[in-house]
């Protein structure tokens, strides 16, 4: 008996995974959070602190002519109390005032003291010239036990004018001084307020006393006020020191009939300097340009949170203790599961999903997989483009803050010279402005950095897409599935922007036609395989039943049913 058995095999052809190249960016496991204009706590790969919080607890004076006044108060360098004898003339880049310093010996005060102090701090030192005043009919040697050298004395730069004898009349006198130099002169004089009317009569004679001072820009009359006051340094009297700035070729005239403390020499400022009030140690072995009462700030950061009264070339004081400046792209950490599973083609993901922590030599880069294996490489062109734009960001921020805040400084310095001091609440208000501006500037720069990083990523994506054209297809995750065999040299040409599209066009088109009609996602492959197996089994069963039916019909096979 001839029995023919036909066997059919159903072969389901599933296309193998194509070569693939993915675009990605650098990521770290733990980034740094910064604030932008639109969002707080944005995580970035890198960030730099812009607020300095540490300093050197010393006055760094290396390379500077430093004058440490010690017990001498700065204003005393003009009038000359005993504690200031060695500082009557000096040159300095840095003037240090100490808490123990005293401006006076005989009790009194300087009018518009703070404004005068500001002028002297920036003076660069003091040079002096005799005013040439001579007197007759009076005494010029008044002394006091409050100003002691070897015995009773007086201010070295002033003359205490007294009646020729006790209770004698003081003559009306007029003295003038013309500034013949090219620089402005600082002129200081005093008005003596006796401890009582009796004391005033003893020193200057009876009658009302009047002192008049005038120049082309200044005119003022003074009347002494004798009276009982608490004793200081054994004295109940007071001396009020007044001052003016005398322009070149201008003349100052003094008219008086007693109670006048006459200047002996005019003072001239030598240049520019910086003055600070501090009690910390001076160190000639370190350098600095920014000083405050607690030491030296040597930071190159744009802001500081150490002291609002720092002087010199300083970071601007802000209330915030930290303002982080983004110097890297937005961070999207790579999930640990993907790091563990990577190695199969399907595990490679592009920039749309997550960053790559393995990309350590660049900000942007590629991953590929082909028959030769897997590889990762940075794209230096896009990385360098981003770095070039971000490098110097800190310096640009310093320029912005210095320009803006120095302008405010200059405006208020002028006001300070006019009114004698700067109101504390005004300084506090300006600190608020600085703090707000600093936070705004940093947020703007952070926004720009993140936008810039995204822009460079998009540029790289467009560069690859334009090269591959229809030779590949983007899968929606930042990866391109290539429709032709692409070895390592081929992958390198894509990265280097030298890929020849036409060279692979024909192969890519043929593979695309085969793949497109049955393009299946990996999630459905198991279902199709089981369906194919079931269909094959059903077909074989149908053939077997058909053969049995034909054999029975032709008599070649007999079927007997027993009950």
Curated annotation (Swiss-Prot):
The chain crosses the membrane at residues 530-550. Residues 551-563 are cytoplasmic. It holds the Pfam family Hemagglutinin. GO terms for molecular function: host cell surface receptor binding. Binds to sialic acid-containing receptors on the cell surface, bringing about the attachment of the virus particle to the cell. This attachment induces virion internalization of about two third of the virus particles through clathrin-dependent endocytosis and about one third through a clathrin- and caveolin-independent pathway. Plays a major role in the determination of host range restriction and virulence. Class I viral fusion protein. Binds to sialic acid-containing receptors on the cell surface, bringing about the attachment of the virus particle to the cell. This attachment induces virion internalization either through clathrin-dependent endocytosis or through clathrin- and caveolin-independent pathway. Plays a major role in the determination of host range restriction and virulence. Class I viral fusion protein. Responsible for penetration of the virus into the cell cytoplasm by mediating the fusion of the membrane of the endocytosed virus particle with the endosomal membrane. Belongs to the influenza viruses hemagglutinin family. This is Hemagglutinin. It comes from Influenza A virus (strain A/Fowl plague virus/Rostock/8/1934 H7N1). The gene is HA.
């Amino acid at each position: 008996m001839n029995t023919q058995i036909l066997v059919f095999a159903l072969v389901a052809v599933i296309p193998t995974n194509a070569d693939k190249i993915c675009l990605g960016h650098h990521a770290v496991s733990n980034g740094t959070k910064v604030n932008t204009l639109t969002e707080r706590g944005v995580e970035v790969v890198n960030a730099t602190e812009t607020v300095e919080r540490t300093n050197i607890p010393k006055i760094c004076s290396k390379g500077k002519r430093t004058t440490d006044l010690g017990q001498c108060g700065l204003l005393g360098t003009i009038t000359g109390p005993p504690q200031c004898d060695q500082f009557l003339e000096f040159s300095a880049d840095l003037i240090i005032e100490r808490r123990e310093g005293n401006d006076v010996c005989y009790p009194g005060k300087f009018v518009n003291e703070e404004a005068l102090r500001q002028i002297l701090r920036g003076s660069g030192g003091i040079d002096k010239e005799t005013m040439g005043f001579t007197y007759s009919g009076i005494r010029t040697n008044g002394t006091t036990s409050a100003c002691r050298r070897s015995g009773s004395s007086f201010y070295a730069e002033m003359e205490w004018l007294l009646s020729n004898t006790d209770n004698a009349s003081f003559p009306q006198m007029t003295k003038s001084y013309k500034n013949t130099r090219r620089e402005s002169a600082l002129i200081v004089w005093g008005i003596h307020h006796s401890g009582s009317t009796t004391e005033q009569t003893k020193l200057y004679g009876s009658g009302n006393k009047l002192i008049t001072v005038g120049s082309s820009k200044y005119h003022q009359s003074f009347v002494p006020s004798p009276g009982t006051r608490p004793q200081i340094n054994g004295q109940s009297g007071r001396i009020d020191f007044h001052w003016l700035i005398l322009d070149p070729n201008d003349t100052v005239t003094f008219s008086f009939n007693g109670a006048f403390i006459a200047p002996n020499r005019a003072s001239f400022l030598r240049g520019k300097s910086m003055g600070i009030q501090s009690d910390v140690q001076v160190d000639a072995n370190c350098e600095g340009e920014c000083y405050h009462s607690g030491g030296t700030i040597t930071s190159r950061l744009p802001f500081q949170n150490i002291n609002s009264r720092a002087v010199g070339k300083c970071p601007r004081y802000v209330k915030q203790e930290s303002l982080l400046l983004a110097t890297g792209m937005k961070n999207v950490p790579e999930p640990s599961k993907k790091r563990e599973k990577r190695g199969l083609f399907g595990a490679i993901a592009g920039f749309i999903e997550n960053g790559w922590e393995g990309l350590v030599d660049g900000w942007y880069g590629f991953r590929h997989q082909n028959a030769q294996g897997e590889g990762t490489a940075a794209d230096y062109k896009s990385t360098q483009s981003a770095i070039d734009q971000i490098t110097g960001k800190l310096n640009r921020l310093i320029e912005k803050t210095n320009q803006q805040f120095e302008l405010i400084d200059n405006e208020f310095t002028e006001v300070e010279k006019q009114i004698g001091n700067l109101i504390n609440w005004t300084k506090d208000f300006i600190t608020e402005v600085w703090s707000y501006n600093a936070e705004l500037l940093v947020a703007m720069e952070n926004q720009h950095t993140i936008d810039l990083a995204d822009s460079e990523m998009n540029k790289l994506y467009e560069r690859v897409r334009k090269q591959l054209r229809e030779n590949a297809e983007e899968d929606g995750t930042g990866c391109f599935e290539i429709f032709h065999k692409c070895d390592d040299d081929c992958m390198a040409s894509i990265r280097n922007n030298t890929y020849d599209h036409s060279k692979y066009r024909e192969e890519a088109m043929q593979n695309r036609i085969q793949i497109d009609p049955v393009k299946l996602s990996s999630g459905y492959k198991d279902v199709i395989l089981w369906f194919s197996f079931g269909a094959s089994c059903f077909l074989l069963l149908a053939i077997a039943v058909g053969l049995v039916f034909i054999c029975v019909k032709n008599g070649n096979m007999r079927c007997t049913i027993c009950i």
